[in-house]
């Protein structure tokens, strides 16, 4: 990978990362901007916090992130979750934040605030989630990583969960991300190479309620930061390449306590599916940008305009896994969300539709 343009010289940085920083801690404050991108900046703390409550509220220039006008540009960062920092190590931390305007209301980009209200209202039903984040890797030239220059690899077929040179690309990058997530405390549950070469997937969950969005956003942050070091750009576009190539989704596995209960689980799952069918277009509206390029009824997707459900059917809007159908309880998989979906929005609307009946 020496031909890539990396932004970090490990050999130069390592001696400085090894320096003693005493009791002081670097806290990387992380937030989501107006376009669904990720931003961050660093604060020095006198000592390691014992909880989120020990962290200071901070602010940033919202006019530079399209989150506020220039004449009233301060946007406030309220810490909501702490993770270990795999880049700096030691007691240094990553701090996920919500964005608030100066009048105390959630910023227009803050979908977490609404999601938290939804999850609090539905907490007795114990909503669990597991999200499957697909993404595509691009090199410094804007080419799909590992693909022939000015050409294409062989047709799809040997790449899904593939092993061997020419079938799998950037496995070292993928492994680095996996380990970084584990170190940080993110509930990453697995990885696999996807159908299109240089397309990968990681899974996060099971997570309860608001925790799902927090952990997926932090996993995305680590993916982008590690990409800086490799000179690789991970893309969450749901259809990064035209033609006979699979798109990228964020399949959303979801259950409530009733769905997981033997004897009545399948009835609860079927009831949820009926509710989801009635709200199909409302869900599509918040399931990610450019999803129409992906949900074509081809390449293991359902039609964007038609709702469908079935056991073990990867061409359906909602899939009931085979083992769930056999045992009669478990969870459902919503296959409609695009890879760039905001996890707070998808988890919130699933609960609103199936539990709160909104």
From Swiss-Prot:
Belongs to the glutamine synthetase family. One of its GO terms (molecular function) is ATP binding. This is Glutamine synthetase. The keyword DNA repair does not apply. It catalyses: L-glutamate + NH4(+) + ATP = L-glutamine + ADP + phosphate + H(+). The gene is GLN1. One of its GO terms (biological process) is glutamine biosynthetic process. It comes from Cryptococcus neoformans var. neoformans serotype D (strain JEC21 / ATCC MYA-565) (Filobasidiella neoformans). Residues 111-358 form the GS catalytic domain. One of its GO terms (cellular component) is cytoplasm. Its EC number is 6.3.1.2. Residues 25-104 form the GS beta-grasp domain. Keywords: ATP-binding, Cytoplasm, Ligase, Nucleotide-binding. The keyword Nuclease does not apply. Homooctamer. It is found in: Cytoplasm.
């Amino acid at each position: 990978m020496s031909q890539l343009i990396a932004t970090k010289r490990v050999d130069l940085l390592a001696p400085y990362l090894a320096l003693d920083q005493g009791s002081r801690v670097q806290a990387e404050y992380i937030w989501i901007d107006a376009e669904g991108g990720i931003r961050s900046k660093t604060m020095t703390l006198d000592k390691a916090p014992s909880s989120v409550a020990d962290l200071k509220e901070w602010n940033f220039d919202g006019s530079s992130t399209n989150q506020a006008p220039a004449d009233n540009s301060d946007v406030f960062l309220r810490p909501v979750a702490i993770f270990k920092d795999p880049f700096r190590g030691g007691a240094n931390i990553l701090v996920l934040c919500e964005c608030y305007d100066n009048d105390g209301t959630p910023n227009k980009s803050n979908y977490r605030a609404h999601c938290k209200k939804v999850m609090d209202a539905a907490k007795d039903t114990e909503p669990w989630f597991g999200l499957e984040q697909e993404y595509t890797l691009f090199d410094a030239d804007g080419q799909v990583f590992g693909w022939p220059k000015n050409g294409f690899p062989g047709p799809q077929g040997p790449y899904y969960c593939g092993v061997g040179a020419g079938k799998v690309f950037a496995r070292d990058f993928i492994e680095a991300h996996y380990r970084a997530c584990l170190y940080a405390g993110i509930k990453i549950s697995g990885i696999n190479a996807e159908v299109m070469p240089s397309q990968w997937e990681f899974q996060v969950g099971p997570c309860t309620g608001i925790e799902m969005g927090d952990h997926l956003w932090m996993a995305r942050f680590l993916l982008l930061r590690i990409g800086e070091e490799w000179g690789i750009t991970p893309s969450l576009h749901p259809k990064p390449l035209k033609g006979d190539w699979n798109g990228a989704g964020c399949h959303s596995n979801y259950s409530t306590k009733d769905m997981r209960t033997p004897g009545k689980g399948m009835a609860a799952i079927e009831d949820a599916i009926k509710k989801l069918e009635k709200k199909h277009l409302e869900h599509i509206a918040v399931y990610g940008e450019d999803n129409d390029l992906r949900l074509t009824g081809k390449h293991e997707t359902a039609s964007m305009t038609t709702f469908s459900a079935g056991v073990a059917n990867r061409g359906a809007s909602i899939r009931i896994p085979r083992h769930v159908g056999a045992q009669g309880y478990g969870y459902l998989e919503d296959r409609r969300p695009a890879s760039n979906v905001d996890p707070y929005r998808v988890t919130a609307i699933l609960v609103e539709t199936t539990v709160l009946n909104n």
